[in-house]
Amino acid sequence: MNTYLLFHLYGPMTAWGDTAVGEFRPSHEHPTRSAALGLVAAAMGIRRHEEDRLQALERSCRVAVRLDAPGEVLRDYHTTQVPPEQRKVRHYTRRDELQASKLHTILSQRDYRTDAAATIALSAKDDPPISLQQIADSLTRPRLPIYLGRKSCPLALPLNPRLIDANDLKKAFDQYPTSMETLRKLTESLPRYGSGVPASDHIRYYWEDRESSPGMKPQMTYPRRDQLRNRKRWQFDTRNEHYFAQIRED
């Protein structure tokens, strides 16, 4: 019997950063390992410069995701005025940039997911510096603001952290309601609006090595660069992520 910590992630907009090159800032369909643990770090009051505490959290948990609803892509376009690059000229503030005699315009775009819902499952590694109970307590009373990838993406449901004992990861997920089920119960008094979350035909699962389950055999395995190496330098290592899709029964 293993212990898992499960909690909801749902909001009108989410953004789970993918590899970004140039002006394009894409989003993964589901929360990444670094995003999930970054959210936990905020709940525990761990600041970005506290490298030792971040590494302790990294060594403590394995992360799995159940994608309850993938949502839809929303692409946001930006135009920004910037000064031309000049040697020996440094702009320390945005005000300094705008005072330049000549300004150029750059275009950028950022992807979001609207009405996406996911369930995170954490399991403890061997001899974890931080326990699942400590994380659950922090998710119940977060010390820093929690957002879903970007500061413009607040939560729309309580995290609802819950420790579950189960034989394997799939059984732990089965014991925890989907975000849509929770939202449906909250909106029963407003039948006109319903749950508001468009569901797909499949429930999708993503997990790390050593977390296979009899009812959840990998259909795909691919590398994912989202395992923290050094937060100050924004360096991440590669890990293997497994994928399994199940036809939705509800």
Where are these regions (language model features)?
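Generic preference for well-ordered secondary structure
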Residues: T14, A20-F24, H49, D96, ...
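Glycine/small-residue-rich interface belts in oligomeric ring/scaffold proteins
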Residues: T3, D18-K88
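Short beta-strand element of the conserved SAM-dependent methyltransferase core
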Residues: F7-L9, L122
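Short polar catalytic/cofactor-binding loops
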Residues: L9-A15
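Internal, well-folded beta-alpha domain core
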Residues: L67-D250
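Charged, low-complexity intrinsically disordered regulatory segments in eukaryotic signaling
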Residues: M1-F7
